[in-house]
Amino acid sequence: MFGEMSGEYGELGVDKERLKEVGIELDKSKRSGVYLQEDQDAKTFSSFFEGVEVMSIKQAMEKYDWVKDYFWKILRKDQDEFTRMADTEDVNGYFIRSLPGAKVEIPVEACLYLKKVEKQRVHNIVIAEEGSELNIISGCTSHPGVAGMHIGISEFFVKKNAKLSFTMIHSWDTTIEVRPRTAIKVEEGGTFISNYILLNPVKLVQTYPTAYVEKDATAIFNSVIVALEGSVVDSGSRAVLMGENSRAEIISRTISKGGKIIARGHIIGDAPEVKGHLECKGLMLSESGLIDAIPELEARYPNVELSHEAAIGKIAEEGIFYLMSRGLSRDEAISAIVRGFMEIEIKGLPEALQEAIRRTIEMAERDLL
């Protein structure tokens, strides 16, 4: 029951404010399922909605013989040293599945917490079965002062005419290195929406999820990233449009206040009549730091439509002066501009997830200004 889970959050020694930083709720009525993992141990998992399954990957493999067929199906074990590290017997992670035709609007919540291990190895499998709709919010964080590495393998399967939105909020520490490896398969008529939020300091994040998008399917990636002094973030998204009339959109908002950001984006038009748009915008808030945008558009057929726009710079003084003329102080004007820059309205995202994103951005403002 959810009441028991509230106690387990307390046992982790994480206060409610830290949980809020990664969108974690303690109210059963606001979630359709929950999963909580500390280091390599799945502490609790439950489903509160008939059309969704939530369990550890170990339990899923015991319950269903076919789950093993989804392991390393769209990612290679030998992709790099970090995928090889994750291919171990003690790996754990979440298994979340919406049943055929189920409409799960209330989000499933997954929390991955690094408490004391040197390397947290996770392998997650998410399946949105045919005609279903599934929304997930994943909050990843670490115990204050702990040094370590999070290696997260995630494979997403969006079946025919299904829709999956996945919002991931990270809040680590300057002693944590993060190496997610993610792939997504979007079948005919399916929709995948990814929202990645990183606003707090971290030692290093390096991630480049890839979506394989089939006929009449859509993949959308949104990211809001802040790098404070000492943080290095190498992040991007890739979409392979491999089916006729498939679509992709990659939108990133990056802010450097002394940190280093490499913002990547890659759309491959590998079928006729596909469309893709890539948008990279960066904001420099200090004299130090770096934002390096690396967009790539690749057309393999003549009748594709791929577009890109990018801009990196500082806050324009004219914008500050305009808001000050409307009665705001200089600090208030800068705060309003930064908040507006980070906010991305995502069509089709449930209000509960929109609110989690807005709340996370508001909490991060105090460290930016």
Curated annotation (Swiss-Prot):
SS bond list: none
Origin superkingdom: Archaea
Family named by the database record: Belongs to the iron-sulfur cluster assembly SufBD family.
A Pfam family matched in the record: SUFBD_core
Name the record gives this protein: Iron-sulfur cluster assembly SufBD family protein AF_2365
GO BP annotations listed: iron-sulfur cluster assembly
